[in-house]
């Protein structure tokens, strides 16, 4: 079971990387800012990234289900010779109690007949101080990186501290 779980985690992380590469070639590469667990794991050099979803904030795009669907459709339509296809399964609003709106995109990715579910949580209006950075996201299985926008380390840490303080409960983040 452990090896099966590890294989599922590896495949999910690989598919999230594939999504990021599609993003890096899309018209939205300068609007989509990576944050959250996947970024933290990449920054500190964890090989076994076990985050359940991809977290991002969007700049200059309304965060409505319709606008996010157009954005994700454009990203997954980017043609890359990687053998991976994506399909949106559902899009719903999240963070109703938060100051800023958010959207959760549930997708499936397919690679060589293996179907892997993915979730992307998207927000807007987040303060990134002083600003987002160009980040060279190192791929797990290839000796190269993807150029994407990401939170700077200070904002990642500040957001994690805010989560701990405002929720006043222990969570997995």
Question: Residue ranges of each PLM-predicted region?
Answer:
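Compositionally biased terminal segments of proteins
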Residues: 1-173
